Amino acid sequence: FQELFTSLYFCDEENYENFKLAESVPGPSTELLAVLAKEHNVVIIASLFEKRTEGLYHNTTAVIDADGKYLGKYRKMHIPDDPGYYEKFYFTPGDLGYKVFKTKYANIGILICWDQWYPEAARITTLAGAEILFYPTAIGWATGQDAATNDEQYQAWQTIQRSHAVANGVYVVSVN
């Protein structure tokens, strides 16, 4: 799933009402997704808005194995604060470190969106044993920018994904 898939990407504005979208991880979404993972024998990587406690929120990805078992979570470490991406208003940087999850099909590493611009994140995760890197992402065309600038940013995004694969000898999956 793409980044924060249970709603539209809400970080394009600073709105306290959006904190109502947060949930515990594991929690209701992971319970439902565990049933689906087991039913379809697939690994599910789900990006969620995590409420850790009152006033402490994370951009978190949960990993559920093909047997429905919750394997754990990764919390986004690099939090942007750019026009249209006001994530520092919502999220605290992750505190779980870079992790590798041993699934039925492969050892996978999870990094989230803005983490992609920091090559050490991909490197550390692959050195820890990841065979595939997954990047749940929410990057789009900025309506206030001209087409040429949007295209340049899109090309940079494509290039950074490819470079992680080549430099680290792994597959990279970016879900946007």
Regions found by a protein language model. Name each.
Residues F5-V25, T53-Y57:
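Metal-dependent catalytic neighborhoods of phosphoester/phosphodiester hydrolases
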Residues R75, I112-C113:
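Short clusters of small/polar residues that mark proteolytic maturation junctions
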Residues D65-A66:
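Short, acidic, Ser/Thr-enriched surface-loop or helix-capping motifs
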Residues V25-I45, C113-N176:
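CN hydrolase (nitrilase-like) catalytic-core segments centered on the catalytic cysteine
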Residues V100-G109, E131-I132:
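Beta-strand-turn-beta hairpins that frame and shape the catalytic cleft
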Residues K76-Y90:
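A short, polar/charged loop-to-alpha-helix boundary motif
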